[in-house]
Amino acid sequence: MAKKVAVIGAGVSGLTSIKCCLDEDLEPTCFERSNDIGGLWKYTETSKDGMTRIYWSLVTNVCKEMSCYSDFPFQEDYPNFMSHSKFWNYLQEFAEHFDLLKYIQFKTTVCSVTKRPDFSKTGQWDVVTETEGKQHRAVFDAVMVCTGKFLNPRLPLESFPGILKFRGQILHCQEYKIPEGFRGQRVLVIGLGNSGGDVAVELSRVAAQVLLSTRTGTWVISRSSNGGYPFNMMITRRCLNVIEQVLPSCFLRWINERQMNKRFNHENYGLSITKGKNPKFIVNDELPTCILCGTVTVKTSVKEFTETSAIFEDGTVEENIDSVIFTTGYVFSFPFLEEPLRSLCMKKMFLYKHVFPSNLERASMAIIGLISLKGSILTGTELQARWATRVFKGLCKIPPPQQLMAEVTKKEELIKRGVIKDTSEEKLSYIPYMDDLAACIGTKPNIPLLFLKDPRLAWEVFFGPCTPYQYRLMGPGKWDGARNAILTQWDRTLKPLKTRTVSSDSSKSASLSHYLKVWGAPLLLASVLLICKSSHFLKSVRDKLQNRIFPYLVL
């Protein structure tokens, strides 16, 4: 008999979890509290149901070739970066293509998920749900929690003295949909993540003035890289990842700063990272121009509010503020879980490889999608789901809970003593994390073997963008179309741009430029790697670089 799996949520994580269950001959039942799939990608004009929804103007930050399910590429005529409606259409196409909708119970809320009395032997769960006021109870062999990390808005009013006496409008960006209601206003946006940048830019078109407050600053990246290619495809490459493992961290920071400041000097624009803070970046094509034109003014963090104004940490005061929009992120929660499991899952370090709670006697629960990646979360959740379903089926193993808890407890103690840094809330490096999960499944690409068997494919895998199709080339879940998808990924990237016929001379020039842009840097880096293959040589170079560069970094 097939094992029964409860999937909580039908967003990007839930949909791939349903499919992965079917791929492993498991029996999924998905519970979705709204009336449709897509989670936050399903746009609605209001958020009265308490669910997080996106704003109307949202555009994806990761290009289509880097943010698709690994065996279901976007249609070639889809734009590289798309509107929320286009992305939701893709999710609908995915669900229909793999016939996933029949496994979803809509307008159903999960009330509780508790261990069965014989959990230590069976790993089973009691799941109580509610549909139209009626409760139902069922037993499942495993549970996949796919509610994501955008559940509850984080509104830290207690951190802003005087905010309660402020007379203007106060809201979280979860409630923001369109800019029209702010026409002619002076608006203060607090927080500079991707949402903060987007909201500030959009408001600048109708508001009298937009003030953008940030504590730490940020690097601002454009969606188009050198030559106009999607930046994700240019920077997310295995060859570059190898180089990052070799070069000293101080040298990498220096290179990154130079690269980031090529487009514009972040310090001049008030965006440079506060000294001692972890570097972060946002994707925004228009923010620098808005700052340059004066429609957006960057400010330091807010010290306190009065009835009509905001006083900032640098002593400046902005009067007559009409609205304050907090873009301060979200707090994830698992209200349906029992204690102490609920509290443990709230600490990411207690999730083995960000998926399995460390304290469970049986690995029959997986938290899917609770990750921050320097890349597409969708592709990360798919690999998590592929791994989790194979663990449920007994095809993959994880260490016993005693070992996992001992390791985490030791790490927690070292963090408290200041011996090591807590990195559980930092964004994970994309390729290392994806490869780690793929190795657990048995789908990590074998680059040396590929160079022997299929040099053309190996070249694209190692020097080209690390697209999700790479994790379908071999092992469990192998997809026959993966090779072709990789070799044609640049064709699908350029297809939506080819809307005007150009002369043959221009085409040849563009083609040459394309190959120089795409392969020039990887070839140069490959040459460096070949020269530096001796570990002794690497050590000496690293020491010399450290000694020569460090004094300049200090200055």
UniProtKB/Swiss-Prot annotation:
Q: Where does the chain bind NADP(+)?
A: 60-61, 195-198
Q: A Pfam family name for this chain?
A: FMO-like
**What molecular function terms (GO) are annotated for this protein?**
flavin adenine dinucleotide binding; N,N-dimethylaniline monooxygenase activity; NADP binding
- Annotated compartments: Microsome membrane; Endoplasmic reticulum membrane
Q: Report the membrane topology from the UniProt record.
A: Single-pass membrane protein
Query: Key word Glycoprotein present in the record?
Result: no
Residue intervals passing through the bilayer: 515-532
Enzyme Commission numbers on file: 1.14.13.8
Write the protein's name: Dimethylaniline monooxygenase [N-oxide-forming] 4
